[in-house]
Amino acid sequence: MDFTVKPRRSLIVYMHSMKQVRQLKRFGLIQYQSRKEHYVVLYMDESQIPAATTKIKKLNFVRRVEPSYRPDVAMNFGERVDQGFFKPTTTGAPDDDDED
């Protein structure tokens, strides 16, 4: 019995009112909700994203739906540091040794 990781992704759902948050539970796991900025982060399987997006957009309390781009971003920053992409700048405060 092998364990396989299912690819998952978040959907950011912007809403007019936060009263209907409970209706979004049937689409996936509510990972975060911001009452001040009126959005909900839903977490679900990658294969369910297209179907869920079209269904959620049809709801009258939803302003817009955006997928999360985090799975598309390469998270291996060690190679970029080795290539010199993140070079530290030496424009800081002058050293005290230069005044002598």
Curated annotation (Swiss-Prot):
Specify whether Signal is a keyword of the entry.
no
Subcellular localization is given as: Cytoplasm
What species is this protein from? Answer: Lactiplantibacillus plantarum (strain ATCC BAA-793 / NCIMB 8826 / WCFS1)
Q: Which UniProt keywords apply?
A: Cytoplasm
Q: What is this protein called?
A: UPF0298 protein lp_2135
Q: What's an example GO cellular component term for this entry?
A: cytoplasm
Q: What family does this belong to? A: Belongs to the UPF0298 family.
Top-rank taxon: Bacteria
